[in-house]
Amino acid sequence: NRTLQRAFPHPPMRLREREQVAWLSQTMARELDMDPDLLRFDFQDDALSPAFNVTAVQSKEISALLTLAQTLNVRIAAVTPDACALQRLLPFIPSGRQCLVWRDESQWLWATRYAWGRKSAREATTLHDLAATLSVVPEHISLCAEGEFDPWRAVTVRQPPVPPDGYRFAIALGLAIGEIR
């Protein structure tokens, strides 16, 4: 997992957005013992507490992507970690569920309203193992799988043919939906 998620309490004084960015950059760099210029991050206010939820990555982790985009004259507005894309499907999971999970051969990707992440399949071999590591009741998890949650529910108008094994497209559909505000 090469991204870092942390919550940082708001600073004691009120700051404008540019000052918030500078303050968070310095705070993250100090916490990680890194040069602030080596970090890329995004943040949002925590809805439940006076804090910022920050997602950060080392610049080197995305430098190849940025170089390729520049070569192709593509302007990148945002880089979205794969598990984060699952958050965009949360409004479509059944009532009473609070976590959406997708799995391939090597990893679990998961998202709740306030957090997201990845666990290797070695760390959590079953859905119950994953639920335990996330401190979530298994019955509150929707799994993107055949006979379980179908991410195509998020698409109101579908043109046939819809691919079989639609659950495999959860990340792509989450990215395509974009940010829901």
Residue spans for each PLM region:
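Hydrophobic/aromatic-enriched cytosolic interaction surfaces used to assemble or bind macromolecules
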Residues: 1-181
